[in-house]
């Protein structure tokens, strides 16, 4: 008995998927509006296994299109479409006043419900925050071009959101890694157990390429701005709720979000410091400066705030009593003074820092150190890293807590080959010293990063210990020794060091090394028995591996062989790098930390540039080998004479280069040989 016949398009891929043209017709939207709605709702095209309408079409799931049909933004988009027709009609009739009035009455919409819909919990929003932060920081550096419909208000909003995020990272001490590349600065922060990574472009003049669809990027940015506002609001209020003073005195909660920018610092292009002065206080200010400048700040900050939320809250709260303001100023002054004294006496290896607590180690790494940033170094990335790791940042300009001549400055960040005037009471380092010290959780030696010297290789902190079997540079081994020494110092400072330690500078593995030494001492009683037992264990492991290989299925064996091939290729690559490093060390082209010396690099470049000229002068296409026999030319091509040796006979009877006696060792290259004619 035959089965029931099914109608075409009622089941399978034809019933589950729909083309983009069909979706646009069903929703009664323009293609640009449909694309915008899909971006805001998070609907992506699908790839069915069998495409019923053709291979060159874009498909969407039918359930997604039905879900879009119930979106409230559809009515708003249709209203905007009808309103645009009215504006165009008024402009066609040369009625400028009506067109201007209608353009000001364009329907608006909000995306708050979409954020709550796509991210049910706050942790979900943090997990999907990487692209949002990268896009916001990108548009914060772009110019407002009317040619590409990039409004100035959007750029200013991105700038404000980026600074608010950086200020929270500094205040909470959540920054963990930073890496400088050609694309920009990669930052990674740990917030509520979630790792958030974003990219900040270099502060250069941006040239907008014409082949980029900025409308699509602005649509993504529209949703990302709303998402980041939600996240910043939640993070700031969580930070405020953690402070006991905010629970006792609710007036402080008005300063949490949005933070108030200091007009003086904002005009001096120190936006991050301007926000930090409000949410955390300028820890690097002297007590006298805090008391003198905070006289009427509580009254002056309210009118200059651009946010309507802050003005409404301030109006509802009313003016604060003068006694209350005096108590607030006195409390801030005392807290700032206490922090100043304790920070100057602390540090990464100071007492009270638990080595197992990464947040405490990161927050106290630069404690008690004042960094003066030169005019040639990037201020914002360095200020973000320095303040997030407990340091104090100063610069040349208005609003700086310290001047360049201040004796409190311990480090000066410069990026010049030579420094004219130097202070003996401070260290002069390159910007890479700050990033490497923050990544490795240890203060690196300053002589390696002195001005005018080639710094060590900038190792990526995102690789970490995941590539233990791969190539390990020499500088990474040096960093590990420094980290072991720093961890041992922190253990001693915290009172957790084991008694009876030898007190050496570089403690290798700590307690694990002591336990291993005890095990070796116990096994040394019967060394021969231990060796026999070890050999038997190896044989047993080999036998088990062979048995497991026999019992594997064909698919599992193929996968296992692929894994072994990849591991072998990896080991071969490591051996190549090791041999290359050995050759560079033998020729003296590599420094002690693996960096290429400038002199050696210049000699290599000069030799490479002079090679074509020597070949042209000799009339051949090969180069004379120093102290070695030149290889035989292919297809009758001549070669220059080898130094001190006779060149081999040419193939097929064609011309060869006449060998001549080379000068003494250490002299110039051999004289070019004359080419014979047939």
Curated annotation (Swiss-Prot):
One of its GO terms (molecular function) is ribonucleoprotein complex binding. Residues 552-587 form a coiled coil. Keywords: Coiled coil, Nucleus, Ribosome biogenesis, rRNA processing. GO terms for biological process: maturation of 5.8S rRNA from tricistronic rRNA transcript (SSU-rRNA, 5.8S rRNA, LSU-rRNA); maturation of LSU-rRNA from tricistronic rRNA transcript (SSU-rRNA, 5.8S rRNA, LSU-rRNA). The keyword ATP-binding does not apply. It is found in: Nucleus, Nucleolus; Nucleus, Nucleoplasm. Residues 283-303 have a biased composition (Acidic residues). Residues 564-581, 662-672 have a biased composition (Basic and acidic residues). The keyword Magnesium does not apply. Its main location: nucleus. CDD domains: BRCT_pescadillo_like. Belongs to the pescadillo family. This is Pescadillo homolog.
